[in-house]
């Protein structure tokens, strides 16, 4: 289970970068939910890890393309084909972006009310967040945001132990494991998933997007 979760986390963390590894346009079946509640069904064109957070390019069934700013959208999602080595076939994985207020703009002088990818949903939500850098080696920096009780907190390799221990304090058996083997930074999705399963109402299943 740990190996699977680690692989799943790695896929989601690298998705936004690897999907732009070449110049081919990446278009996927999906939908956009506008701020007025209207849902548009069609295709979503990927732009870049950071531009996907500040706007979304939607293509209607008639081929007309419209770019919506984050201020106009509450959420969007699309089906991303993930290769399953066990079946040697592709399985659609739902990628979901929702609007949240963050502390850092993804692009210079950009908005801080943006659309970010929700990787884990439940009592604690986990979001992947990308921001542009000035580094010649890495164009984008990846961090997380975690959310509990509608409070968004930025989380990185340096502060994850403090933040997660506080968020899972009502599950002491898990709290003491944070930062230990199998519960390090690369396992934050698994740790949050375990906590969400512990706190979920009986019979409910809250977890990673699939």
Regions found by a protein language model. Give the residues of each.
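Aromatic-patch recognition
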Residues: 33-35, 40-174
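Short, solvent-exposed mixed-charge patches
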Residues: 22, 208-210
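C-terminal partner/receptor-binding element of secreted or periplasmic proteins
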Residues: 173-207
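Short boundary/loop segments of OB/S1/cold-shock single-stranded nucleic-acid-binding domains
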Residues: 25-34
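Bacterial Sec-dependent N-terminal signal peptides
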Residues: 1-26
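Exposed beta-strand and adjacent loop surfaces of beta-rich binding modules
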Residues: 16, 29, 53-55
């Amino acid at each position: 289970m740990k190996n699977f979760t680690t692989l799943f986390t790695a896929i989601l963390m690298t998705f936004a970068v690897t999907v732009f590894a070449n110049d081919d346009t990446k278009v996927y079946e999906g939908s956009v939910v506008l701020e007025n509640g209207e849902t548009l069904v069609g295709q979503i064109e990927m732009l870049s890890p950071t531009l996907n957070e500040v706007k979304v390019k939607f293509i209607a069934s008639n081929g007309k393309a419209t770019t919506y700013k984050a201020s106009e959208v509450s959420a969007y999602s699309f089906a991303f084909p993930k290769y399953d080595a066990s079946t040697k076939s592709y399985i659609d994985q739902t990628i979901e972006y929702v609007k949240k207020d963050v502390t850092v703009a993804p692009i210079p002088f950009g908005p801080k009310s943006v659309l970010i990818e929700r990787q884990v949903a439940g009592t604690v939500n986990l979001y992947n967040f990308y921001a542009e850098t000035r580094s010649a080696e890495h164009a984008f920096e990846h961090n997380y945001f975690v959310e509990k009780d509608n409070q968004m907190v930025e989380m990185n390799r340096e502060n994850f132990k403090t933040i997660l221990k506080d968020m899972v304090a009502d599950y002491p058996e898990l709290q003491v494991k944070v930062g230990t083997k199998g519960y390090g930074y690369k396992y934050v999705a698994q740790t949050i998933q375990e906590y969400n399963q512990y706190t979920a109402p009986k019979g409910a299943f809250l977890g990673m997007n699939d």
